[in-house]
């Protein structure tokens, strides 16, 4: 059975007023690039649950610390605004195992890998493309990141580095 593992915020990057990346130092959470973890904070008073958790995709590759998550802040949401306000040193909880089948191993062999992302959907692709697996499995790798506004083009330095592969 999965348990909550306590981590600490080591970085909080506010890309825009609604796009945030959190870097979290936490006990090892085994995952495959493309998977997601549940992040949580203590539930607010009156809740039936002790923790309020939601799924967020890893942005970092499995061999890189700290864990990184990229998300939209939903102003009226119960969790994302609270996560966005966390400062370095503050606690956050992760479920001790990752989930999801959006991984390179699940893809059939082909000549090209097309990675089409909008907004924060870029996150799992960055996790995958920073491993060797897609570059060994596919002859061509194409990443498309579509956003509404230029200011929402996050991680341009990472994307530029990937373009040199």
Where are these regions (language model features)?
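Ferredoxin-reductase
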Residues: 2-90
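FNR/FR-type flavoprotein reductase catalytic core
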Residues: 78-165
